[in-house]
């Protein structure tokens, strides 16, 4: 069985189960100091957005950290948002996963979640949203995931998810599952 057959089979199963599934592929090349949205989707019901990211090149400078960012937000300005990001230190340092949340543009949570050796720029991140308001997040390097964690009461309802890139060149393969 090929990967495309497996994906088609899984998509058919999810459709029968009342789950919508979609696959997206992005290539990005965002210069240092710039921030670009690669994808945005409204979030009806419960669902998840998961991405495998492959970084080819990082553009570094004094002020900005090169990163790919997943966001779960209530408003278009993303003043009420959870951001899950990953970046590396210059000169081959470890990969760090970082969580930040904002309510009315004020920072609420800002913490490093996990550090791991960088696996040639390949890593995974996911956010999930729930009708009860909770937001889940998960991350990993190469083929393994860390345990899913939650912000039970973020102070806002997720109305859309988005993917952003800043100071990086690479690709992302993403899957959206929604009920």
Describe the function of each predicted region.
Residues 22-98:
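Secretory/extracellular carbohydrate-interaction modules
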Residues 121-139:
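Short tryptophan-centered beta-strand motifs in secreted/extracellular beta-sheet-rich domains
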